């Protein structure tokens, strides 16, 4: 057998083995989808999130107003969290979800200003006023290290303009669609545009 043919066959076998291993690994890993929905109440879908003192699911009459079969399917096949602690504003809650840390540990306890650091003269100097950064133990990075491809879609508001958290790709997402430092659209009907083009109707 000539060297060129032997080399080609060895490479083909090696590639086939690698693809087989990759396929087997992919089948062992479940897909992970996390929805973080702003201002959605525990009674705003047909999935009941209330529980009694023993942890049994309790349906509220308002749950009957909605028909959300896909959410029901996700809840039945996935994990539903019904006991948790949330901050009074979104930035600390979002940072806790991304890091798995309590707000007292990641030191984000206030809303992150989209345009600049919002620490006043009374704010603690050692506190985190700019949100997520690449040195924090964020779960998208852990997923990347485990071989996952990660994508962020929608509102991010992980950090202010100029900070690492401004771009979700800096904190572990391979792909970012729509996420930036802005925490809300320019207007409900987008008449002033979205995100960084707020106030610029021509765009």
Predicted regions and their residues:
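Bacterial Sec-dependent N-terminal signal peptides
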Residues: 1-28
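Formylglycine-dependent sulfatase
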Residues: 26-203
């Amino acid at each position: 057998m000539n060297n060129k043919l032997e080399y080609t066959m060895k490479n083909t076998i090696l590639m086939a083995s690698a693809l087989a291993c990759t396929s087997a690994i992919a089948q062992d890993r479940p897909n992970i989808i996390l929805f973080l929905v702003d201002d959605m109440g525990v009674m705003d879908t047909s999935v009941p999130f209330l529980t009694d003192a023993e942890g049994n699911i309790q349906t509220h009459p308002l749950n009957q107003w909605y028909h959300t079969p896909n959410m029901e399917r996700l809840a039945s096949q996935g994990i539903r969290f019904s006991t948790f602690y949330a901050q009074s504003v979104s930035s600390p809650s979002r940072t806790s979800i991304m890091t798995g840390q309590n707000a007292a540990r990641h030191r984000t306890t206030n809303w992150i200003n989209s345009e600049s650091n919002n620490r006043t003269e009374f704010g603690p100097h050692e506190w985190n006023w700019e949100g997520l950064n690449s040195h924090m133990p964020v779960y998208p990075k852990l997923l990347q290290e485990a071989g996952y491809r990660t994508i962020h879609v929608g509102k991010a508001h992980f950090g202010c303009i100029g900070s690492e958290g401004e771009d979700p790709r800096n904190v572990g997402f391979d792909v970012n669609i729509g996420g930036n430092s802005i925490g809300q659209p320019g207007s409900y009907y987008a008449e002033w545009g979205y995100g960084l083009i707020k106030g610029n109707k021509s765009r």
